[in-house]
Amino acid sequence: MYLEKLRSQNPLTICITNDVVKNFTANGLLALGASPAMSEYPEDLEDLLPYTKGLLINTGTLTNETWELYKSALDIAEKYGVPTVLDPVAAGAGAYRKKVTLDLLHHHTISLVRGNAGEIAALIGESIETKGVDSAQIDNVGELALRANQQLGIPVVITGKKDAVAVNHQVRILENGSELMPLVTGTGCLLGAVLAAFIHLADEDSLLDCLEEVLSAYSIAGEMAEQKTSLPGTFQIEFINSLYAIQSEEVEENKKVIHYE
């Protein structure tokens, strides 16, 4: 349902993201049916955000200058009521990154935060082994998502071998995906942009169902791509193709979702 809505609306989605993934992010959004813009100047954002359906802040390329950009973008988005997704890249890997992320969370309106287990744990004062942007897997990702949702007061998406989404203290675990996805730089970053493109389509009561569909579609597209290739280089191409081709019926038939209690 939400895939069709996105494709019919072709929503403008602004992505302030890291330098490594801009091309991949734009192509992924285009394949799904959104309209990406990589605007990085406050005056330009002032012009574009009134027409924008979602904003991604990805802190991968972090400097004092980009920190100021994030804050300016969030201020403008709040003025125009644009929902925002925060992707706190490597928030658990160092004090500076954690400080910036917590500043954004505490002083700006964030609609949803997406990260791996180590990143999300760092935001609520917990510790999970991290190495740069990577984190060790944990046994109970649903419990971590619930704690983060409760403490941060906003929807939380955790991605990894199993994904978890928590909205209003309700949690779902999602078990689709491909082992090749972590071998392609930017699959997590692109997901943050995808969430930003979709989030406006749901109200508070339907957001959990929307996020379940989006996360499932994204991971099932990875499975579809793996059926075409076992090599990471060509997987990236097939993944974009699968995002373009995937239909809601395939998501409904193949999704693996557990309602966490």
Curated annotation (Swiss-Prot):
InterPro entries of this UniProt entry? Hyethyz_kinase (IPR000417), Ribokinase-like (IPR029056)
Which residues take part in binding ATP?
A: 114, 159
The Swiss-Prot or TrEMBL record annotates one GO molecular function as: hydroxyethylthiazole kinase activity
The record's function comment reads:
Catalyzes the phosphorylation of the hydroxyl group of 4-methyl-5-beta-hydroxyethylthiazole (THZ).
Q: What's this protein's name? A: Hydroxyethylthiazole kinase
One Gene Ontology BP term is:
thiamine diphosphate biosynthetic process
Q: In this UniProt entry, which cysteines form S-S bonds?
A: none
User: Could you tell me which Pfam families the record lists for this protein?
Assistant: HK (PF02110)
The source's superkingdom equals Bacteria
Binding residues for substrate, per the UniProt record?
38, 186
| Pathway listed | Cofactor biosynthesis; thiamine diphosphate biosynthesis; 4-methyl-5-(2-phosphoethyl)-thiazole from 5-(2-hydroxyethyl)-4-methylthiazole: step 1/1
Which key words are in the record? Answer: ATP-binding, Kinase, Magnesium, Metal-binding, Nucleotide-binding, Thiamine biosynthesis, Transferase
Q: Which family does it belong to?
A: Belongs to the Thz kinase family.
Q: What EC number(s) would the UniProt record show?
A: 2.7.1.50
Query: Which reactions appear under catalytic activity for this entry?
Result: 5-(2-hydroxyethyl)-4-methylthiazole + ATP = 4-methyl-5-(2-phosphooxyethyl)-thiazole + ADP + H(+)
Q: Spell out the HAMAP family in the cross-references.
A: Thz_kinase
Q: Which cofactor does it need?
A: Mg(2+)
